[in-house]
């Protein structure tokens, strides 16, 4: 029999209240449990009354092989760090964007590339007439210099 220390929801709609219970992992979330070892009221401000745990019972159940869920393990670690070593779970897929977000990012990147290409073309077009005019002005100066050499 696999034991879990987990939350069992109670309270009214939009007003949650949780019992921290030891239960068989196969039993329903709010169903039958073996023992109630604490409570969690998320409606209270963050203070000592928000999470109440009987740490002696918690340690006894952990010694018997019960494993806390992530949330309850975090509560246990916050109250008494020696009782349970809580580590943040690593889920790299959670941070990965969804299909629509990937498509939107690809469209945005494509539009950005088109916009940059258009800017480059505009700069090149603006520089080309200036480049054509500049050699035309230099050419008469070069001709004038050549004429001066001939006249000498």
UniProtKB/Swiss-Prot annotation:
Keywords attached to this entry: Ribonucleoprotein, Ribosomal protein
Ranges of compositional bias, category Low complexity: 124-144
GO molecular function, one term: structural constituent of ribosome
GO cellular component, one term: small ribosomal subunit
Oxidoreductase in keyword set: no
Keyword Ribonucleoprotein: yes
Residue span of region Disordered: 84-152
A single GO BP: translation
Biased segments, Basic and acidic residues type: 97-123
Top-level taxon of the source organism: Bacteria
Residues annotated as signal peptide: none
HAMAP family reported in the protein's UniProt record: Ribosomal_bS16
Family: Belongs to the bacterial ribosomal protein bS16 family.
Protein name, as recorded: Small ribosomal subunit protein bS16
Chain's gene name: rpsP
């Amino acid at each position: 029999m696999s034991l879990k220390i987990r939350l069992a929801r109670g309270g009214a709609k939009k007003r949650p209240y949780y019992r921290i219970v030891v239960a068989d992992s196969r039993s329903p979330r709010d169903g039958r449990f073996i023992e109630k070892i604490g409570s969690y009221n998320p409606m209270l401000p963050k203070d000592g009354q928000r999470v109440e745990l009987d740490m002696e019972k918690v340690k006894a159940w952990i010694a018997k092989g019960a494993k806390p869920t992530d949330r309850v393990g975090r509560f246990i670690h916050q109250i008494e760090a020696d009782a349970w070593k809580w580590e943040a779970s690593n889920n790299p897929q959670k941070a990965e964007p969804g299909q629509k977000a990937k498509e939107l990012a690809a469209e945005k990147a494509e539009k950005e590339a088109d916009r940059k290409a258009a800017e480059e073309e505009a700069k090149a077009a603006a520089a080309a007439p200036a480049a054509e005019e500049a050699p035309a002005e230099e050419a008469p100066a070069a001709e004038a210099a050549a004429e001066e050499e001939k006249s000498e």
